[in-house]
UniProtKB/Swiss-Prot annotation:
SUPFAM superfamilies registered for this protein in UniProt: UDP-Glycosyltransferase/glycogen phosphorylase (SSF53756)
Keywords, comma-separated and alphabetical: Glycogen biosynthesis, Glycosyltransferase, Transferase
Protein's organism: Actinobacillus succinogenes (strain ATCC 55618 / DSM 22257 / CCUG 43843 / 130Z)
Functional description taken from the UniProt entry: Synthesizes alpha-1,4-glucan chains using ADP-glucose.
Top EC category: transferase
Family affiliation: Belongs to the glycosyltransferase 1 family. Bacterial/plant glycogen synthase subfamily.
Domain of life: Bacteria
GO BP term, example: glycogen biosynthetic process
Protein name per the record: Glycogen synthase
Gene name, Swiss-Prot/TrEMBL: glgA
Positions contributing to ADP-alpha-D-glucose binding: 15
Length: 476
């Protein structure tokens, strides 16, 4: 099946969020199971640098000016680049300038992305014609609208990575974009008097997916729907809304071949984990003690990530003799709070403000518990890394966290299902009780190792997601 992924970023060439990780891994996994997956992306400077060797597929003029469509290969995956320097030759963030002002021509920049996607389903490339156009987030949302306007020449799938960003622009741009005027309708791409590229993707796609089954249900509610819960509920009732879990890229995140850690290990040879733990304690200037549980948190320091919940009950970790290590940056008041906590407990708490890729890998490899107490989390990746590395996730029951971590209740441990720790309510006392359960299990090392083994046996690789998407494509 010929699948075209339409996106505005992909790892490792250009990344601002989790969307890039998905598009950087899913097409290769799809190729591995027999689908012919390719990528369409604007030719930003970072993309050009990563794919310097291309051939011209087509040249044309349309509402966006003069455009050249090019084709190259990156890590074995075919990539179409939309070469329009007047729109895309801007360094840095693909969406806004250095002062965080959205580019005024974003409606045109991402309108062109959707338009080219639809044309690749109509034969713009003589040698390859998309059978499925799989658009990602609002930037690619108009692809589905253009396909609908052109008679549905291909199946259309739209994946929500972040529902909060809705790509809203003035209604006057509709005619310039070449879309039918009657699409500007509540039963169309209109949202509160504006064009919404996100809503276009939702309304006109054959199938809408998001990054976990639980989050797919949550976004049909007022709490998580960002004003689109009515449309999303309708899609759910029509069986046009599904959740497909993100995967983990084993070439980057696997304890047996992780390029960033010194001591590799695997399920039947775990000595390297203890060595990584000692290195981690040294890195954070904490006492090197193998007998205390190490809690790690790698996150943006925001309330959404539940950082404030943790800080209100971090004393539970300290008082029971555990160690807490935090890596991240974000809200200034939370940064001040974590720094204060570390200053008060220099033998128990270590903090690194900022981001450090090698350190994040060492924390996952050397920790015993990875904390993800988010208020909401569409999918989450750090808990998946924790499972793979035998660093038990402690998570709140929401979104993808609920779909990927099984609580260490007595019943689940006995049935060999338990893989971590789960709490329900976004309240400090609920998290405190969960931390107490961690220490209880830690005191029973044999049982701890059993849970750790089950955690490491879980398979959340991209191949699983690729098969799930193949099934969805065939259902359309």
């Amino acid at each position: 099946m010929k699948v075209l992924h339409v996106c505005s970023e992909f790892y490792p060439l250009l990344k601002t969020g989790g969307l890039a990780d998905v598009v950087g891994a899913l097409p290769a996994a799809q190729k591995a199971i027999g689908d012919d997956a390719r990528i369409l992306i604007p030719a930003y400077p970072a993309i050009w640098r990563g794919i310097p060797d291309t051939v011209v597929v087509a040249e044309f003029d349309n509402f966006a000016g003069h455009v050249t469509l090019r084709y190259g290969i990156y890590n074995g995956v075919g990539v179409y680049l939309i070469d329009a320097p007047h729109l895309y030759a801007r360094e840095g963030n693909p969406y806004h300038d250095q002062w965080y002002n959205d580019y005024a021509d974003n409606y045109k920049r991402f309108g062109l992305l959707g338009w080219v996607a639809s044309e690749l389903a109509l034969g713009l490339d003589f040698w390859w014609q998309a059978e499925v156009v799989h658009a990602h987030d609002w930037h690619a949302g108009l692809a589905s609208a253009y396909l609908a306007a052109k008679g549905h020449p291909a199946k259309s799938v739209f994946t929500i990575h972040n529902l909060a960003y809705q790509g809203k622009f003035a209604a006057r741009h509709l005619i310039e974009l070449g879309l039918p005027v009657d699409m500007f309708n509540v039963n169309g791409l209109e949202l509160y008097g504006e064009i919404s590229y996100l809503k276009a993707g939702l309304f006109y796609s054959d199938m809408v997916t998001t990054v976990s089954p639980t989050y797919a249900k949550e976004i049909t509610t007022t709490e998580f729907g960002y004003g689109l819960q009515g449309l999303l509920s309708t899609l759910d009732q029509q069986n046009r809304l599904a959740g497909v879990l993100n995967g983990v890229d084993d070439s980057i995140w696997h304890p047996n071949n992780d390029p960033y850690i010194h001591h590799h290990y695997k399920l039947k040879s775990m000595s390297g984990k203890a060595k990584n733990k000692a290195l981690l304690q040294e890195r954070f200037n904490l006492p090197q003690n193998p007998n205390v549980p190490v809690f790690v948190m790698i996150t943006r320091l925001t309330e959404q990530k539940g950082v404030d919940l943790l800080l209100q009950c971090a004393d539970e970790i300290v008082n029971q003799g555990g160690q807490l290590m935090i890596l991240g940056s974000g809200a200034p008041h939370l940064q001040d709070w974590v720094n204060w906590l570390a200053s008060q407990h220099p033998d128990n708490v270590g903090v690194w403000i900022g981001y450090d890729e090698p350190l994040s890998h060492l924390m996952v490899a050397g920790g015993d518990v990875i904390l993800v107490p988010s208020r909401f989390e569409p999918c989450g990746l750090t808990q998946l890394y924790g499972l793979k590395y035998g660093t038990l996730p402690l998570v709140r029951k929401t979104g993808g966290l609920a779909d990927t971590v099984v609580d260490s209740s007595a019943e689940n441990i006995k049935a060999r299902r338990a893989t971590g720790f789960v709490f329900n309510n976004a309240e400090p006392e609920a998290l405190r009780h969960c931390i107490q359960r961690v220490f209880s299990l830690w005191s029973k090392q044999r049982t701890w190792f059993t849970v750790r083994t089950v955690a490491m046996e879980q398979d959340f690789g991209w191949r699983v997601a690729a098969h799930r998407y193949h099934e969805l494509y065939n259902k359309i």
